[in-house]
Amino acid sequence: MTSAIRIIGIDPGLRRTGWGVIETLGNSLRFIASGTVMSDGDMDLASRLCQLHDGLADVVHLHQPDEAAVEQTFVNKDAVATLKLGQARGIAMLVPARAGLPVAEYAPNAVKKSVIGVGHGDKQQIHMMLKILMPKAEFKGNDAADALAIAICHAHNRGGERMRRALAG
């Protein structure tokens, strides 16, 4: 008999990094927890990255996921903001990798398509589908909701070739 796989989805951001933990067994999804790790905007960049690292490390230690999924970042017109987001994303990938978890990456439109059926939807559609897919899901804010959507996307796609290679090491 196969056991449930616990997945952490991470929505990286320098101010707020959302996280969501679910379990999947076959086609069923079960909400475990979600939240947001915050960094202090008055602190220097290195200290803010440490806050994100330590907060995510605490979440991974507490919830003991088996696999992780992180949303890929997009490039916007503000190069400095894009670089900072990339650094936060590096932390979001490093923490689960250091815990020995395979880490998958998903584009934002792939996450939306997996959860709401189309690649371009709004936050309200994601919130509604999260409640349909996992009626007991609790999330405060878009970052935690997005992280749960990333975890669901991974649950739906974890059998893919790229993930099989990551799991094989």
From Swiss-Prot:
UniProt entry tagged with the keyword DNA damage: yes
A GO BP term here is: DNA repair
Residues annotated for Mg(2+) 1 binding in this entry: 11, 143
Q: How is the cofactor bound?
A: Binds 2 Mg(2+) ion per subunit.
The reaction(s) this protein catalyses: Endonucleolytic cleavage at a junction such as a reciprocal single-stranded crossover between two homologous DNA duplexes (Holliday junction)
Q: Which key words are in the record?
A: Cytoplasm, DNA damage, DNA recombination, DNA repair, DNA-binding, Endonuclease, Hydrolase, Magnesium, Metal-binding, Nuclease
> Which Pfam families has this protein been placed in?
RuvC
Q: What's a Gene Ontology MF term here?
A: DNA binding
Q: Does the keyword Ubl conjugation apply?
A: no
Any one annotated GO CC term: cytoplasm
Per the UniProt record, which EC number(s) apply here? 3.1.21.10
Q: List all membrane-crossing ranges.
A: none
Q: Which InterPro entries match?
A: RNaseH-like_sf, RNaseH_sf, X-over_junc_endoDNase_Mg_BS, X-over_junc_endoDNase_RuvC
Q: What is its main location?
A: cytoplasm
Active site per UniProt: 11, 71, 143
Annotated Mg(2+) 2 binding sites: 71
Subunit: Homodimer which binds Holliday junction (HJ) DNA. The HJ becomes 2-fold symmetrical on binding to RuvC with unstacked arms; it has a different conformation from HJ DNA in complex with RuvA. In the full resolvosome a probable DNA-RuvA(4)-RuvB(12)-RuvC(2) complex forms which resolves the HJ.
Family designation: Belongs to the RuvC family.
Q: What does this protein do?
A: The RuvA-RuvB-RuvC complex processes Holliday junction (HJ) DNA during genetic recombination and DNA repair. Endonuclease that resolves HJ intermediates. Cleaves cruciform DNA by making single-stranded nicks across the HJ at symmetrical positions within the homologous arms, yielding a 5'-phosphate and a 3'-hydroxyl group; requires a central core of homology in the junction. The consensus cleavage sequence is 5'-(A/T)TT(C/G)-3'. Cleavage occurs on the 3'-side of the TT dinucleotide at the point of strand exchange.
Q: Please report the name of this protein according to its UniProt entry.
A: Crossover junction endodeoxyribonuclease RuvC
